[in-house]
């Protein structure tokens, strides 16, 4: 197989990954010839590897005498058990001058805001003082109901600076979704923006904020700001708590205070999607998340100081945490809040050109949407600084690789990356010193013993199986919130294979040492006892111009499972019988006869999580007349109605 892109030798030699390969080779008197050998060293010599990159990345903190305690235990291993570090300190206290740009924030109204490093530090200082006056201490929880703007970053860094725990939900969460999350984690302080705008529609969040503050007895203080509509609110004065306006930057900044927390001290609570019950509250540490995210930025993305790093995300998705960690590399992070198509397909690309982004991160769904429009970057849009496009959220189709290189930019590193909320980082991602192969994630992340297991727990190559990690790594969660004996934590990741992290993705390792993800394990189809990943079907179906997107489930029928394919058609397109035949032929030609759906049904929309992922399990439940456990976790629960009592499915 030929690569679709290869790095130039000059680029390889100047990369941080190449620098690390040479450093580890030199310091350990060995010769690591390529990325595969560097990766093998990183998982076979964990203590040396994590100590080396701590120093090489310039992290501020104390390592302690031991780099890894109980390496044979999973869970149970501890990285830097004597170490002390603070996530926020590493993002704020370095040699970036006060007049440099730390944050550029955009929203769909066209508003552009810049925060210098000095303004960011002064703003965090003011917010830190407000939290202290509210009685916030280490290990208290601060909850953000916030859009992706500077206020969210300021509040999070101030929270982390005190050793308190930051947890956030985006404005697309309704009251029940917020209570399902904050009701478990019991924040002491709520930080909230009163309005947002999405797809040109203003949304007033005041009533939701009042409701959650009334319901959450743990909340003693509400810190609020106007949001996009710039209207000051007075309704909060009636709440049985202290209501404060978001503070202005400090004019007489003293030296910022940072709690030197243990490496394993909790920093973030992130939430699972909650589509199978109440969301899991996943606890991540200062040290584990910081060292993992900075590693990904500096080596896997080759991010440098002063470069512009963008990822399209909300504060309810782990990619927001991933993005703000870019400050620790002294990069400028770019925020965008609103619809990525508010001004058409060019919306984000125009900002990319104006702001000189180096890294453009987005979702596979977004790239697919551009591809469906056959949009291409205009000739006058040179995008001179852009050198990497990152995609995540779902598998990036093989055809989307072609689209990026043919229609968006031909000389970029296209990194399909994958991990999850569970590890607030990636298992597989880009590698600037390796070639890109169509449809593949370039490789496993440094320090991560990623493998594919068959049903018996044996490693397999070029064969589909369970994505696992066989050795501990720093970004493993501390555990779940309110799970003192870690029973739920162990059940979630370590029951399938003893002492091995099972991630829940159905994947394979390729001959090029890359990876292909075929879908979620719990959504795998099983007709006639043969396991089929849904992504294999979606890839074929979404090549049809008439079809916007697809979702496949296995329907139990006559003591077997039949594959049912649901498609959303483009406007003014119909699912004709001849189109169904074409779909079946293409799937059969490019996969196997087992992949061919027994039924193909047109629906108006597919249900999605709040982070935009389609939910096969919820559809499967509706089709089998089973209850959907947590509709509040869906962005559009009304879409489930389209799957009820479909005549074809009753036959």
Where would I find each of the regions flagged by the language model?
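AMP-dependent adenylate-forming
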Residues: 26-30, 88-116, 230
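Adenylate-forming
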Residues: 189-208, 229, 337-341, 357-403, ...
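Conserved pre-ATP/AMP-binding loop-to-beta segment of ANL
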Residues: 101, 224, 237-271, 278, ...
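Conserved AMP-binding/adenylate-forming core of the ANL superfamily
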Residues: 37-41, 88, 103-157, 174-179, ...
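Structural core segment of the AMP-binding/adenylate-forming
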Residues: 158-244, 347, 355, 363-364
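Conserved AMP-binding/adenylation subdomain of ANL enzymes
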Residues: 290-308, 318-358, 373
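Conserved AMP-binding/adenylate-forming
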Residues: 299, 387-514, 521-524, 537
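AMP-binding/adenylate-forming catalytic core of the ANL superfamily
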Residues: 144, 169-195, 353, 473, ...
